[in-house]
């Protein structure tokens, strides 16, 4: 068990840790996306200024084409046109065309949510973006400034927090 804790800590530092210490970013948070588990985890800084304290976990849906790597957010959009002639709310650009955004809507209208797509949260289902519930993606939109570090990876790492189940 001690070995498991040690491995977890080493992986955590590799995901958000010392490479992005307090002096290198002004963001209060670092975000990781486990594309295998379909979980977004938000970390805040510890006393030493490293992002090691998990504070939130969200169920998400990534895609088979979602890139792995470390990125910094670069733009935000209350509504954003998405691939496939649909819309997403509270989008935050991760890199290139890849965004955090809500489950898609048929129109730029809160009453047109694609319920079938909502029910896919927790599975690999997007064209590459990271889909999250409106409540959770709005938290990122409101609390994580442009320049926030995002680390996306695939692996069987046990996440430190488990997201609340998404009601179907």
Go through the PLM ranges and name each one.
Residues 14, 46, 50-52, 127-132:
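Long hydrophobic alpha-helices with heptad-repeat/coiled-coil character
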Residues 20-79, 89-91:
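Cell wall/extracellular polymer interaction/catalysis modules
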Residues 24, 66, 77-168:
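Exported/periplasmic cell-wall-interacting domains
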Residues 1-20:
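Sec-dependent N-terminal signal peptides of Gram-positive bacterial secreted proteins and lipoproteins
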Residues 7-10, 62, 115, 121:
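Exposed boundary/loop context
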Residues 6-9, 47, 80, 136:
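Generic hydrophobic alpha-helical segments
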